[in-house]
Design a protein with these regions (language model features):
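Ligand-binding "clamshell"
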Residues: 121-133, 146-148, 220, 225, ...
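Bacterial lipoprotein signal-peptidase II cleavage site
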Residues: 18-50
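Short, polar/charged alpha-helical segment
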Residues: 45, 67-89
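Short, well-ordered beta-strand elements
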Residues: 56-68, 86-92, 158-160
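Sec-dependent N-terminal signal peptides of Gram-positive bacterial secreted proteins and lipoproteins
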Residues: 1-26
Length: 301
């Protein structure tokens, strides 16, 4: 398989977001000690709605979140919770260690930024006791056109660019398998690498690149396989431009659903249950679908 090394430096929240919210299961990829000094924390305004002044107050729910799409979705849910007597307070964190630490310590009730593999890996490495209180959304991988626009036009020697980190590469390879481009060894699942390709009927080459670089070679390769965040950044519309993308019933979607995480024992508390129900409401599902054009999809199970 062909592998191109790119020297471009990648910075910004999106690069980390793919690891924590959209595809990495290695908590070691973030370092608590380094991020404590550099993380910028911005607290959004509390929801204060005069129309809800007659609603009996049930208390405050504090949530640590990443900015996009998590905090945006939470902001949309504030009025729903306010109507039920809950004051939802959202604080945006720019790293992916502190949101777990502040929930573990009890400073915050919940966080919303990560998928289950990252949560489990963080618990194992840091000795925390965080659990999934409810899956809210997933960010699908999609196959996007490069120099070709139809998978049926694939020819021997065509190159398909995929992310090179373990979990994101596995998702890309599984999506290619689901669409008949390759066949993987049985049972490799979300640990698949290019070495697990058992059949390659089109004779394509898989080019492994850092996730943030994949979209940048679209003009040089037949197809690119991208996470939803990177697709948005590159100007793609998931619903309009993706040739194929992960469906809600796919193994990847169920595994990498972004969740509300809480300290063990708090998952059934009244406030957390109200929060999860609000985020899974028809109103919030519509908000997600209308706002993110397929790059973020409500998880309904």
């Amino acid at each position: 398989m062909k592998k191109r090394v790119l020297s471009s430096l990648v910075a910004g929240v999106l690069a980390i977001g793919v690891l924590a919210g959209c595809g990495s299961n290695n908590a070691e990829d973030t370092t608590a000690e380094n991020n404590q000094a550099n993380a910028s924390v911005t607290e959004t305004e509390n929801a204060g709605d005069a129309d809800n002044s007659t609603v009996e107050s049930k208390g405050t729910i504090t949530v640590a979140a990443s900015a996009t799409p998590h905090a945006e979705i939470l902001e949309a849910a504030k009025s729903i919770l306010a109507d039920e007597g809950w004051d939802l307070q959202v604080t945006v964190f720019n790293d992916y260690v502190q949101p777990n630490e502040v929930v573990e310590s009890g400073e915050f009730d919940a966080n919303y930024f990560q998928h289950i593999p990252y949560l489990e890996s963080f618990n194992e490495e840091k000795g925390t006791h965080l659990v999934n209180a409810g899956g809210i959304h997933y960010e699908p991988f999609g196959i996007y056109p490069g120099t070709k626009t139809d998978l049926a036009d694939l020819a021997e020697g065509d190159v398909i660019a995929v992310p090179n980190d373990t979990t994101n590469e596995a998702r890309a390879l599984l999506l290619l398998q689901d669409n008949g481009v390759i066949k993987l060894k049985d049972g490799v699942g979300l640990e698949a690498t290019v070495n697990d390709i058992e059949e390659n009927p089109y004779g394509v080459e898989i080019e492994e690149l850092e996730a943030a670089q994949v979209s940048r070679v679209a003009g040089e390769v037949a197809f690119v396989v991208l996470n939803g965040n990177y697709a948005l950044e590159a100007g793609y519309s998931v619903s309009k431009d993706a040739i194929a993308y992960e469906t809600a019933d796919s193994e990847a979607a169920k595994t990498y659903v972004n969740v509300i995480a809480v300290k063990e024992g708090n998952e059934n508390s009244e406030g957390i249950q109200a929060l999860v129900q609000a985020l899974k409401s028809d109103e919030i599902q519509k908000f997600i679908n209308d706002t993110y054009d397929g790059a973020v999809i409500p998880f309904t199970e």
